[in-house]
Amino acid sequence: MFVGKLTQNHAQDMGNNMLKKNIFYFFFILFIFILDRVSKLWIISIFNSENNLEIKISSFINLNLIWNKGIAFGLFSYGEKFEYNLLTGLIIMIISIVFWMIIKTKGLEKYGFLMILGGALGNIFDRLYYSAVPDFIDIYYKNFHWFVFNVADIFITVGVLMLIINEITIKNHK
């Protein structure tokens, strides 16, 4: 009887810990999504009210609102509705795969996928709401400008880097 009770309590503790972790993961994703939304709403309001073409932040960062109908860095920007809808559908499928990967992974890899999902949800929201993603961070050096991006893109990029680092670390330990 005592062993059965101990096992039952252990199972309850494990269930409670898993619930706490899942709640944390949910709020982690929600934080990324909200941070991205707030930054985009802020930049849209500035550019709508000021009609500025560019705001200089420093000698290497500008704010410059660009409506991106493609994917990362403006790639695959299509003017046709069919191609845009096809691309949006593919992105939603990829988001579903990332969600599944979060369930299946742990550690650094899980946090990489959580960051990717948070950023991807921010960008897919914009694609569905605005039919484009507002990009606004312009990093440059002299006449060389990197692709204009947003906060969601930062989290997606950091998440991918975490996955790469995790993969390299695992391969080096084998």
What kind of feature is each model-predicted range?
Residues 2-174:
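Alpha-helical transmembrane bundles and membrane-interface segments of multipass inner-membrane proteins
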